[in-house]
């Protein structure tokens, strides 16, 4: 048994058939993950690391240690302090942090991370975990390219003061008009602005729908709407966007209209009709 620094100097004679059969017990309470990998590589016997209460190092190195379950014994409840920052500008792959979180019941200190990348679901998992500490000011690149829910983007936006950027290849945003306008209007979210939008409301205020239409050059699918409310001017603006070529709003035409004006021009009403 011994401290990790001494154990790293043990012979690693590859000429011995089957390798060394050192019985090793690490006496340190805090160990760098890459050093532990070096030590268990020197023996064919599982290294006892039950004295270790803290692992430090890069996420990849720590996960390598946990994955080598036949090489060590006594791991699973350690605190972990990681040293990753931004993966050379590409953002730390958040799925690897979630894997690490699953590998130990101890707290994972992630305060060195300055940038993430990954799916929105994985990002929300990391920020929602009680086992990960030190998060809250990272930038995040969301890699999803198919469909995202605006409410989920807003949730992620609320968990970090860093800017959250969606993929330039994102195809569709979905959600209520309120949630969508919140997402597009947030200084903490950077959304491309050319994605299609599918709204889920059955009733919407025309002004809010027009505001949404101004946020994206993609077509807004309003098929779920049964009622449109608002001033006649705003309602006419929304329906004109549906009638335009190319249209920027689709699905309007058979909704109940509830006007909020007290006085309207007959010509404007004829336009709506």
Task: Indicate residue ranges for each PLM-predicted region.
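General marker for long, soluble alpha-helical cores
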Residues: 1-273
């Amino acid at each position: 048994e011994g401290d990790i620094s001494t154990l790293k100097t043990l012979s690693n004679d590859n000429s011995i058939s089957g390798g060394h059969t050192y019985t090793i017990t690490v006496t340190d309470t805090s160990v760098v993950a890459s050093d532990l990998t070096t030590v268990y590589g020197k023996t064919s016997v599982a290294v006892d690391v039950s004295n270790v209460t803290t692992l430090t190092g890069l996420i990849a190195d720590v996960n390598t240690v946990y994955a080598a379950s036949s090489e060590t014994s006594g791991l699973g409840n350690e605190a972990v302090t990681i040293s990753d920052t931004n993966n050379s500008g590409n953002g730390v792959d958040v799925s690897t942090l979630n894997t690490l979180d699953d590998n130990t019941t101890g707290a994972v200190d992630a305060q060195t991370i300055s940038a993430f990348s990954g799916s929105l679901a994985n990002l929300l998992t990391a920020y929602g975990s009680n086992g990960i500490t030190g998060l809250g000011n990272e930038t995040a690149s969301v890699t999803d390219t198919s469909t995202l829910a605006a409410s989920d983007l807003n949730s992620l936006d609320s968990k970090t003061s860093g800017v959250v950027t969606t993929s330039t290849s994102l195809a569709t945003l979905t959600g209520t008009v309120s949630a969508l306008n919140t997402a597009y209007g947030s200084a903490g979210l950077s959304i491309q602005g050319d994605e299609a939008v599918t709204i889920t409301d059955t009733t919407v205020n025309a002004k809010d729908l027009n505001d949404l239409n101004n946020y994206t050059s993609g077509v807004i699918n309003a098929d779920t709407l049964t009622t449109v409310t608002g001033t006649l001017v705003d309602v006419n603006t929304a329906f004109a966007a549906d009638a335009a070529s190319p249209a920027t709003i689709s699905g309007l035409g058979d909704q109940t209209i509830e006007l909020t004006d007290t006085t309207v021009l007959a010509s404007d009403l004829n336009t709506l009709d």
